[in-house]
Amino acid sequence: MHRRGVGAGAIAKKKLAEAKYKERGTVLAEDQLAQMSKQLDMFKTNLEEFASKHKQEIRKNPEFRVQFQDMCATIGVDPLASGKGFWSEMLGVGDFYYELGVQIIEVCLALKHRNGGLITLEELHQQVLKGRGKFAQDVSQDDLIRAIKKLKALGTGFGIIPVGGTYLIQSVPAELNMDHTVVLQLAEKNGYVTVSEIKASLKWETERARQVLEHLLKEGLAWLDLQAPGEAHYWLPALFTDLYSQEITAEEAREALP
């Protein structure tokens, strides 16, 4: 027996049903979007009330400030996005991170002749705290990272390089690719690295290792020690702390400014 073909009426009915399902789906999606938008507005209002109530604690307590920033991030609010507006006027965070950014630049410039423009986050944190004095608003490493990201967005040459369990802060516009970053990570343990160590650990050819090290030397990020036993050592001054035993004075920071 031959199967009967589907009639025009059945096809039209099927298309009508599909159109209704599609229309219903659109209505549901719009309802969900409206509900989410309403919840988001309510959450933002509650966040503003929370900020108003706890603004002193947000400004003074670094840990509390981190938690507040995370709360803001969940709804896409960035208190640092502008120097003006509700958040900066209420909390003063715009001015806080602007001033912190200026201080970071001053410290990095003052130390540039020692470290070539690379400094660990821990060392930067210590130097910033020294410069602020004991009566100034407390600053956390998270605050530093947020301020540096703002500096980076301005095209100032600042960057953040993950190294082991910490970060190196780059304050010069040197171009560093993945090879350079891997070598910096390798040098973290001793503060220096050799061509042989790179070849053994990373399985690189000699020329590749030399090119990376020569670039770091050229950018002033590494020092070459030809008197070291065995073979030349390439020291990364940002990774050893003997150079930072002296506190940076205010005069030294000012002299470093252009």
Swiss-Prot record:
Q: Which UniProt keywords apply?
A: Coiled coil, Cytoplasm, Disease variant, Endosome, Epilepsy, Intellectual disability, Membrane, Methylation, Nucleus, Protein transport, Transcription, Transcription regulation, Transport
Q: Which residues cross the membrane?
A: none
Q: Which GO terms describe its molecular function?
A: channel regulator activity; lipid binding; protein homodimerization activity
Q: Tell me which GO cellular component terms the UniProt record holds.
A: cytoplasm; cytosol; endosome membrane; ESCRT II complex; extracellular exosome; late endosome membrane; membrane; nucleoplasm
The Omega-N-methylarginine modification is found at: R4
The main location is: cytoplasm
Carries keyword Coiled coil? Answer: yes
Give one GO biological process term.
regulation of protein complex stability
- Tell me which domain of life the UniProt entry assigns to the organism this sequence originates from: Eukaryota
The family database entries (Pfam families) matched by this protein are listed as: EAP30 (PF04157)
Q: So what does mutating V102I actually do?
A: In NEDOA; likely pathogenic; fails to rescue defective embryo development in a zebrafish disease model
- Quote the subcellular location field of this record: Cytoplasm; Endosome membrane; Nucleus; Late endosome membrane
Reported effect of changing R208L?
Answer: In DEE115; likely pathogenic
As recorded in UniProt, coiled-coil segments are 27-53
Q: Which family does it belong to?
A: Belongs to the SNF8 family.
* Function per UniProt: Component of the endosomal sorting complex required for transport II (ESCRT-II), which is required for multivesicular body (MVB) formation and sorting of endosomal cargo proteins into MVBs, and plays a role in autophagy. The MVB pathway mediates delivery of transmembrane proteins into the lumen of the lysosome for degradation. The ESCRT-II complex is probably involved in the recruitment of the ESCRT-III complex. The ESCRT-II complex may also play a role in transcription regulation by participating in derepression of transcription by RNA polymerase II, possibly via its interaction with ELL.
Question: What's the disease link here?
Answer: Developmental and epileptic encephalopathy 115: A form of epileptic encephalopathy, a heterogeneous group of early-onset epilepsies characterized by refractory seizures, neurodevelopmental impairment, and poor prognosis. Development is normal prior to seizure onset, after which cognitive and motor delays become apparent. DEE115 is an autosomal recessive, severe form characterized by onset soon after birth. Affected individuals show massive reduction of white matter, hypo- or aplasia of the corpus callosum, and neurodevelopmental arrest. Death in the first year of life may occur.
Subunit relationships: Component of the endosomal sorting complex required for transport II (ESCRT-II), composed of SNF8, VPS25 and VPS36. SNF8 is essential for the stability of the ESCRT-II complex. ESCRT-II interacts with ELL. Interacts with TSG101 (via the C-terminal domain). Interacts with RILPL1 (via the N-terminal domain); which recruits ESCRT-II to the endosome membranes. Interacts with 14-3-3 proteins.
The protein here is known as Vacuolar-sorting protein SNF8
GN (gene name): SNF8
